[in-house]
Structures are given as C-alpha cells and as structure tokens.
Amino acid sequence: MFLAQEIIRKKRNGLALSSEEIQFFVQGITTNSVSEGQIAALGMAVYFNDMNMDERIALTTAMRDSGTVLNWQSLGLNGPVIDKHSTGGVGDVISLMLGPMAAACGGYVPMISGRGLGHTGGTLDKFDAIPGYQTEPSSELFRKVVKDVGVAIIGQTGDLVPADKRFYSIRDNTATVESISLITASILSKKLACNLDALAMDVKVGSGAFMPTYEASEELARSIAAVANGAGTKTTALLTDMNQVLASCAGNAVEVKEAIDFLTGAYRNPRLYEVTMGLCAEMLLLGGLASNEADARAKLNRVLDNGRAAELFGKMVSGLGGPVDFVENYSKYLPQSQIIRPVFADMQGYAYSMDTRELGLAVVTLGGGRRKPGDALDYSVGLTQVCALGDKVDSSTPIAVIHAQSEAAFAEAELAVKKAIHIGETAPEKTPEIYAYIRASDL
C-alpha cells in the first residue's frame, strides 16, 4: 500500500519511482482516489525532475492498462497489426493514404486518431467532412471493418486509456504539457492500447511542429522509440519536416480531396509522397511484410498504381457509414465554400520561408479549426494550391487559394497568408523531407 503524497514527495526530491508506485498512482487517477491537486503536483514534479526510461515505460504501460486493451486474436487476422502516429502539423493528410496503402500490402491498421486543436489539423475532422462517416462506431463495427477491409480510422472510445484523459486535462490547466516524459506516455498509452505489432512514429520538426526546436523534436522521437520498444512494440520514429505545409492544402474537405487524388494518381504532391512512403515502408518492414526498403516501396507503388489502395479507402468509408461511391464521386459529397479565390504575393521572387503555424491558424480563423475543444467546424474552408518553398511567384502565380465563407473571412485570411509566406530574391536551400530514422538499433 502506497500513499499518493509520499510518491509525490519522492519525485519532488528527484528520486526514481518504482513501477509499483507508478501503477498505484495511475490506478488512483482512474478511480478518482487520487485528487486533482495530487495529480497536478506529480505532473509538476515530473516536469522539473523528469523520469528515467524505466519510469517512462512503467507510466506508459500503467496508463495503457487503465482501460480496455484491444485484442485482435479472436478475429484470426492473417497479417500484422500496424499503425502510425504523428505529432501533428499543417496539411498532414498522411493517415488517409497510409492506412489503405498498408492494408493493401497485407497489414491491419486499427487507427485511433484525434481532432485538431491549436494550429494543427485533426484526422477525425477530415473524416467528419464525409457525410455519414462514423468516427465513433461501436467496437463491433470497428473490429468488423478492420477485419473485412484491413483499415478503420476512428476516434478514441471512452473505455480506452481513461487515465490519460484525466491526467492530460489537468496538465493542460497546470502548465505541464511540455514534459517529454509525460508527452511520451500520453501518446504511446493510446497507441499501445490498440495492441499493435508495430508502430511508425512521425515526429515533426520546424515552424509548424509541436516541439519548438529540432533538438526537442529529436529528444521526443528518441524517447518514444525507446519507450515503445521497451514496452514490447516494434517502433521506429521518423523526424520529418514541417517548415512548410506538407500537402498542397490545409483544411478538412480540401485535404480529403487531396488524399483521394493521391490514391487514384490524379495528383501526388512530391513532398507528401516522400513522407507517406517513408512512414508506410517502415510499417511494412517492422510488420514483416517487406524484406527491405526497396521491396516495401515497390509493394506500396504497386497498390497505388493498381488502384487497390483507393479501393480499400472507399470500402472503409462505406463500411463506416459513408457513401458507397465516395472515391468516384467525392465532389458530389464534400462541402464547398462560398468564396474560392487566389492570393498573390506583393513582390515577385521565390517562396523563401514559411511560418507554418500561422498558416494553420489562418485555417482556424476561417472556421476550419478549433479555438477551444467542442467548437463546431466549417469543413469546407481552408487553403489549396499552397506554394512550396523554392517556388517562383509573381503577379500571375498565387501563393495560395483561400476557401472562405465571407468576404471578411477571406480578407483576414489573405493578410495572414501573405504575412506567413515570406518571399525572397533567391530560392532557399532545399531541406530533406525526412531528417532521420530512429530505430531500435539506434537506441
């Protein structure tokens, strides 16, 4: 038997907690036998004194086990259960292509995603733009679609990781969100509750990333890779670039359109393609579905080119309540804004740098993101044809096209976009889409 205040005192004094102490405290978070003040105090103690890797693994697994842990054995799946998670960015539509692509190569992808908050878009918000799509299906329907289609992308159910829900809301109100130990446990407890065989982790770097510096992003990526592998899930973390919008657009319906164009081959943004392939290939390798990276990429290109990945996206949409002909006729179903108009730079030159966070906030201002949890969204608004760094721009080449519902909203977004995309006389040096892979062998 432990006392919550003694556990707090121990961490306050900079000592390591045992896995039993951590389990006791997390159980108290779940059962409400630990008070909000005690949770806040432990959060602050961890923020200042950190946790070693054993403590992080213990915290992650205790939070994972605080609710239901999914079990796939009874379904008799004939392939690995694999997934990816992103720390979030702007124009990060990867999940919509990656899930069906991995499923088409023999994996099973039970992806539990989130909604957008702040400047980053949420995968669930994109699916909410599709009429009828259930982001909160029954567990029976979720399991059925995973088994029959190979991929289902839904929201977190109430019985998964209840400890994280309570802990996170208290951290949010007490300025302890930025602790890498606590971020690691929060992210991974939700993913590991899906009982995955393998996970590819996408940690963003740059002006639109969650972490402020490359060093902080790398520290988080290393922590996630070490803890996930330590908890028994094969995991690789990729450090990927978010110094510019990843897709050619940012929003909800506009990103769904880009995802379908990518899957059908109508248009594939080269940067988006590179990061999607990098993450998806890693999932296949970790899941034993490919012998090396070249083999993985060949398999992925095959399911893109033969239409199998697009077909599975359509089956997932219809399986979860959306239209059966969505892939073929998406323009009939996706909402469109009143005003669709280009924005031009005030000078000619090259797109030199981008405040990606500000572009994400421009989408929020248009109504496509939340200022606070629970806000209703306008799924039609956003940005399309966003220029890439190094693109030449002039009075006839727009830096973006704004989708807005009113002249006032357009004018506000136009100012924000012009301010966020900096034009230079020369093109900037090209940066890689993927900076680094952090595999178990690198830890």
Swiss-Prot record:
Its EC number is 2.4.2.4. GO terms for cellular component: cytosol. It holds the Pfam family PYNP_C. InterPro entries: Glycosyl_Trfase_fam3 (IPR000312), Glycosyl_Trfase_fam3_N_dom (IPR017459), Glycosyl_Trfase_fam3_N_dom_sf (IPR036320), Nuc_phospho_transferase (IPR035902), PYNP-like_C_sf (IPR036566), PYNP_C (IPR013102), Pyrmidine_PPas_bac/euk (IPR018090), Pyrmidine_PPase_CS (IPR017872). Pathway: Pyrimidine metabolism; dTMP biosynthesis via salvage pathway; dTMP from thymine: step 1/2. It comes from the Bacteria. Keywords: Glycosyltransferase, Transferase. One of its GO terms (biological process) is pyrimidine nucleobase metabolic process. NCBIfam families: PRK05820.1 (NF004490), T_phosphoryl (TIGR02643), Y_phosphoryl (TIGR02644). Homodimer. This is Thymidine phosphorylase. The gene is deoA.
